[in-house]
């Protein structure tokens, strides 16, 4: 019977400790080799939490699938902050260019509830609200209204 383990690991810095080691150890596979493989595959997401799915079949063959980090992590990396605002409505911790929001939306489009880029960008900007990040120097809610009004259609089509 195949086993599947889903974990969130720091990109490029997974260890054989929890949560990976205890989950894979009883399966009788080489945990260090799996961790090394995960680190190679997640190196580009260094410093971000990355979802990883590890599948072990009956013959102890391991398949590793790396997901895309959460939208919050991508926004924070793009802005260059370690942590979101404790009071996002009053304390602003950074500014995200609209082009970066579009780039993140394109990256995450398959994992989002949105079917169109425009609504995916709105989801990313909605994340900015909860992190305490402005978009193009404006409050995210203002940008959302502007997107709905079609003011950013040229950026969304580029």
Swiss-Prot record:
Superkingdom in the source lineage: Archaea
Q: Which GO terms describe its cellular component?
A: large ribosomal subunit
Q: CDD domains under this entry?
A: Ribosomal_L11
Q: GO annotations under biological process? A: translation
The GO terms describing molecular function are: large ribosomal subunit rRNA binding; structural constituent of ribosome
Question: Which keywords does this chain's UniProt record carry?
Answer: Ribonucleoprotein, Ribosomal protein, RNA-binding, rRNA-binding
Asked if the keyword Acetylation belongs to this entry, the reply reads no
What the record says about family reads:
Belongs to the universal ribosomal protein uL11 family.
Subunit note: Part of the ribosomal stalk of the 50S ribosomal subunit. Interacts with L10 and the large rRNA to form the base of the stalk. L10 forms an elongated spine to which L12 dimers bind in a sequential fashion forming a multimeric L10(L12)X complex.
Entries under HAMAP family matching the protein: Ribosomal_uL11
Q: What does this protein do?
A: Forms part of the ribosomal stalk which helps the ribosome interact with GTP-bound translation factors.
- NCBIfam families, from UniProt? PRK01143.1 (NF002232)
Spell out the protein name for this chain: Large ribosomal subunit protein uL11
This chain's source organism reads Methanosphaerula palustris (strain ATCC BAA-1556 / DSM 19958 / E1-9c)
């Amino acid at each position: 019977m195949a086993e599947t383990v889903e974990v969130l690991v720091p990109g490029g810095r997974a260890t054989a400790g929890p949560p990976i080691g205890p989950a894979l150890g009883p399966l009788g596979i080489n945990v260090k080799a799996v961790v090394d493989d995960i680190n190679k595959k997640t190196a580009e997401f260094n410093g971000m939490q990355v979802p990883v799915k590890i599948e072990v079949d009956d013959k102890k063959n391991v398949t590793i699938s790396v997901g895309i980090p959460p939208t919050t992590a991508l926004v924070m990396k793009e802005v260059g902050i370690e942590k979101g605002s404790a009071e996002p409505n009053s304390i602003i911790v950074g500014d995200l260019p609209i082009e970066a929001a579009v780039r993140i939306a394109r990256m995450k489009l398959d994992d989002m509830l949105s079917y169109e880029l425009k609504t995916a960008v709105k989801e990313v900007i909605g994340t900015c609200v909860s992190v305490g990040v402005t978009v193009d120097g404006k409050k995210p809610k203002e940008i959302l209204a502007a997107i709905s009004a079609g003011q950013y259609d040229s950026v969304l089509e580029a």
